[in-house]
Amino acid sequence: MLSQSLLSGMRVLRTEARRNFGIVAPALNKASDPIQQLFLDKVREYKQKSAGGKLVDSNPDIERELKTELDRVAKQFGSDGKTDMLKFPEFQFPDVKVDPITQAPQ
C-alpha cells in the first residue's frame, strides 16, 4: 500500500515537472530559434537603455514636447511647480467622529 502511494506520487511529480519545464525554459534565456534570440537581445538592449530613467530613443523634439505637455497639464490642474505631475496623487480623507448616542457627525 505504501509503495503504491509512493509510485503514484512519483508519477504525479514527473508529470508536473514535465509541464513546468515549458514554463521554465524561456527563463533560461537560451533561444531555440533566431527570432526568439532577436527578441531576447532587444529586451536586454531596452533594459540597458531605460536604466537611466529617461525616455528611450528620444530626441530633443520629443523631450521638448513632453515638457510642453507636462506644463500644460500642470497649468490645467493648478500645479504649484513643485508637484511631480507624473506621480499619482495621494488622497487623505479625515476620519469623521460620530457621537455613539445620536449617530450624528460632530
Curated annotation (Swiss-Prot):
Residues annotated as transmembrane: none
Superkingdom, taxonomy of origin: Eukaryota
Subcellular location: Mitochondrion; Mitochondrion inner membrane
Keyword Nucleotidyltransferase: no
Gene Ontology annotations of biological process type: proton motive force-driven ATP synthesis; proton transmembrane transport
SUPFAM superfamilies: Mitochondrial ATP synthase coupling factor 6 (SSF111357)
Gene Ontology molecular function: any one: proton transmembrane transporter activity
Keyword annotations: CF(0), Hydrogen ion transport, Ion transport, Membrane, Mitochondrion, Mitochondrion inner membrane, Transit peptide, Transport
Annotated InterPro entries: ATP_synth_f6_mt, ATP_synth_f6_sf_mt
Main location: mitochondrion
Gene Ontology cellular component list: mitochondrial inner membrane; mitochondrion; proton-transporting ATP synthase complex
Assembly behavior: F-type ATPases have 2 components, CF(1) - the catalytic core - and CF(0) - the membrane proton channel. CF(0) seems to have nine subunits: a, b, c, d, e, f, g, F6 and 8 (or A6L).
Role description: Mitochondrial membrane ATP synthase (F(1)F(0) ATP synthase or Complex V) produces ATP from ADP in the presence of a proton gradient across the membrane which is generated by electron transport complexes of the respiratory chain. F-type ATPases consist of two structural domains, F(1) - containing the extramembraneous catalytic core and F(0) - containing the membrane proton channel, linked together by a central stalk and a peripheral stalk. During catalysis, ATP synthesis in the catalytic domain of F(1) is coupled via a rotary mechanism of the central stalk subunits to proton translocation.
UniProt similarity note: Belongs to the eukaryotic ATPase subunit F6 family.
Protein name (record): ATP synthase-coupling factor 6, mitochondrial
